[in-house]
Amino acid sequence: MIIEDLGIIDYVAAGELQRQRLEGVLAGTGPETLFILEHPPVVTLGLRGGAENLHVSEEYLRQHGIALVHCDRGGNITCHYPGQLVAYPIFKIQAKTGGIHRLFWCMEETVIRTAAHFGVVAERAEGRPGVWVGPRKLCSIGMGVKRGVTWHGLSMNVSKDTGLFDIITLCGLRGASATSLEK
C-alpha cells in the first residue's frame, strides 16, 4: 500500500485519480492506495441523492465559486472545503478488513482517536453514520465498492470555518450541524 498526499485538488480530478487507481487494483497492476487531500469548495450529492437538502440555487453556488457534483459514493449530501482532511482508501476490503462494515468502524475509530489526541471527545451516534462531538458532526463517511475494492472515503473537519455546511441539510439529517477539531 502507498500513501499519496495530493494537496488541494478539484473533486472531479480526484475522482478520476481514484478511478484510475481502482482499475489498477482490480486488474492487479496497481497498488492499494490511501489518498490524503483537501478539495476547493464543493457540494457533493451521493447515491442517496440529497438535492432537496441543498438550500441555495445552482446560480448561488456558481456566484460563490462552489462546485456541485453528483457522484457515485454512498450517502447523501455533504460539503468539502480547504481545511477539511479527506482520505480516500483504495483497498481490497475482504483481505484487509473482513468487509465494508468493519472498514467503516476502523475509519470511525481512527477519527475518534485522532480527535482524542487533540483533546476532543468524539463518538459514534446510534443510527447516524460518521463521527460526532455531541450533536455536531465532525466526520462524514461515504464510500463506494467495486468488486471488493473501496473508493471514496471520509472527510474530517479540521478548520473552524464550517460555514459551507449552512447551505445544506448535512447528510440529509434534519437538525444536524457540523463542528471541527478547531472548534
Set out the residue ranges of the language-model regions.
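Short conserved catalytic/interaction loops centered on acidic-Pro-aromatic/His motifs
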Residues: V120-A125, W151-H152, L164-I168
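Active-site donor-binding loop signature of nucleotide-sugar glycosyltransferases
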Residues: I8, M143, K183
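A hydrophobic, small-residue-rich beta->alpha segment in the mid-to-C-terminal subdomain
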Residues: G163-K183
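A short beta-strand motif that forms part of the nucleic acid-binding face
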Residues: G49, V145, G172
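N-terminal lobe of the biotin/lipoate ligase/transferase fold
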Residues: M1-L138
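Short, conserved beta-strand/beta-arch hydrophobic-aromatic motifs that form part
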Residues: L54-Y60, L138-T162
